[in-house]
């Protein structure tokens, strides 16, 4: 009888622990889509320059916000996109070209710190759409 009670106690503890882990995992997974919706919900319209280099904004730069962790672009046409950063030390540093299909959100840059100055370039030509940063 002692062994049977002890076994039930251990099984109950395991079940409670597993249930707690499941609840915590579900809560974390549910938070991720909310963050993405919040980020993309603040998207702005963009229109690149009409001549090469095809970029947005047409001059200067924009600054990342705490709304998004990444720089997200939804071009009307499919295009190779890259993000160019302007560090406070001067100069410009651009990441590699990334293909983003027309009409869908794609990542132009990931894990970008808040307050980072940047602009976006399009390789194939004039582009317009939405950007969230």
Q: PLM ranges: what are they?
A:
Residues 1-53:
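N-terminal prepro-regions of secreted/extracellular proteins
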Residues 30-133:
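Post-signal peptide N-terminal regions of Sec-secreted extracellular proteins
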